Regions:
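A short acidic, Gly/Pro-enriched loop at the edge of an enzyme's catalytic core
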Residues: 288-300
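A short glycine-rich, Lys/Arg-flanked "PGG" loop and its adjoining helix->strand segment in the class I
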Residues: 315-329
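Arg/Lys-rich, alpha-helical DNA-contact motif
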Residues: 40-117
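Basic helix-turn-helix/winged-helix DNA-binding cores
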Residues: 1-59
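Conserved beta-strand signature within the Rossmann-like core of class I S-adenosyl-L-methionine
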Residues: 328-336
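Conserved alpha-helix/loop element of class I SAM-dependent methyltransferases that forms part
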Residues: 208-227, 243
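Class I SAM-dependent methyltransferase SAM/SAH-binding core
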Residues: 231, 242-288
Length: 407
């Protein structure tokens, strides 16, 4: 029979059969351009399947076939070396089973620990009373007054901060909301968003995220973070904060700012399960309405916050936030840059300059940040469901910057 019929009878693909032919495990007769398979081919195939069921690899099966074909009629099954092939396979399988059992037991222990972790009660994360003096009105820069506060363990959980100018900042679940309150969407299940993000995002994009995130982490943890105020603009789901959380000193204040209350609630809930506890202040606000003192920020974390802002604004975000920064502050940034823009690009022409390296470097120079280290990624052609700003024909890359102003 021909190869198609032979494959159909044995429920094998033509590619698999051709592979067996290439290894000389099956040797059909060839007439012209076609192979023809007889009962000997069928017998060899059944033996291949039998040996595979015993755990032999195709190369090991080739060696067994040499015995079958070259020692025919010599009662080769009794040959000591032939038998040793089966004995070696058996011993190897025993070792693999033993190793798998050890791995299974370790995995069982990890699963047990994970279940215990899930049962751990959450610690309370609110606004520490000790940071109130740092909070000021984003409109007039005057001090804020706590009103109707619910306090637990020296942390404000609910209430509002008011200013004499009339501005109010609600405190909900330990999160300050400035300006319009971005209400939590009860139907948004962010618990599954991390796994969904991984599955829906291009591997090269994820690899770059990990590589640049590790680069930034190493820069930050080598700084003296004691008694420092860190401002993270666009904390999102907290990819960066969660990676450095345990590295933060107890007396370091980390301010996570995002427009999306859902993401802040998710991040807060995740960190509430972590030990030891760190001083994190969550603010839900537009970037231009962050209610903190001018010239109070020691370290700026801008992990694509400026780039995300630039999708909708022409002004350079770091320039807008500059009054908040100390004269000698550090900047740790990651910018999304475009190698090219397609004719149907989603980036409005007026906003494109902020996605070019020359503009970024010029703005950083204008802000008097001097480079300590920089990193530029390879080009990326795809993002994914959550990084859908790319269109066909466009390529992006990331530029990471670590620098300082010297006052």
């Amino acid at each position: 029979m021909k190869i198609g019929k032979f494959g159909e009878v044995n429920n094998l693909s033509i590619d698999t059969i051709r592979h067996y032919i290439d290894l000389s495990l099956i040797i059909p007769e060839k007439k012209g351009a076609h192979y023809f398979f007889d009962e000997y081919c069928q017998s060899d195939l059944e033996l291949i399947i039998h040996y595979k069921d015993l755990g032999f690899s195709l190369n090991e099966i080739k060696e067994l076939f040499f015995y079958k074909n070259l020692a025919k009629s010599m009662n080769y099954e009794k040959d000591i070396f032939y038998q040793s092939l089966f004995k070696l396979k058996y011993d190897k399988m025993e070792q693999e089973i033993e190793l798998l059992e050890k791995k299974r037991d370790k995995l069982k222990g990890v699963l047990h620990d994970l279940l215990l972790t899930n049962e751990t009660s959450n610690t309370i994360i609110g606004i520490e009373l000790s940071v109130l003096h740092l909070l000021t009105c984003s409109k007039c820069s005057k001090k804020l007054i706590l009103q109707d506060g619910i306090i637990n363990n020296n942390q404000i959980i609910e209430g509002k901060l008011i200013c004499n100018c009339g501005e109010e900042y609600m405190i909900t679940s330990g999160i300050i909301s400035a300006g319009k309150l971005f209400k939590a969407n009860e139907q948004t299940l962010l618990e599954n968003i991390i796994s969904d993000y991984i599955h829906e995002t291009d591997n090269a994009y994820l690899e770059n995220m990990h590589r640049e995130g590790e680069w930034a982490k190493k820069k930050l943890i080598h700084l003296d973070l004691n008694n420092k105020l860190i401002l993270d603009i666009g904390s999102g789901l907290g990819f960066f904060l969660r990676s450095i959380y345990e590295e933060l000193p107890e007396d370091c204040l980390y301010i996570a700012v995002d427009r999306d209350l859902n993401k802040l609630l998710f991040l807060k809930d995740v960190l509430a399960r972590r030990n030891p506890k760190r001083n994190i202040l969550f603010i839900c606000a537009d970037f231009l309405n962050i209610p903190i003192q001018n010239r109070s920020v020691d370290i700026v974390i801008d992990h694509s916050g400026t780039s995300n802002y630039s999708f909708e604004h022409e002004n350079f975000l770091l320039h807008e936030l500059n009054p908040l920064f100390k004269s000698n502050c550090y900047l740790l940034s990651l910018f999304i840059l475009f190698k090219n823009f397609s004719s149907n690009s989603q980036i409005t022409i007026n906003f494109r300059a902020n996605f070019t390296l020359s503009k970024i470097k010029k703005e950083l120079q204008n802000l008097q940040f001097q480079s300590i280290d920089e990193s530029t990624s390879n080009y990326l052609k795809r993002g994914g469901k959550y990084e859908d700003f790319l269109v066909q024909g466009e390529e992006i890359y990331t530029y990471s910057f670590f620098g300082k102003r010297w006052g």
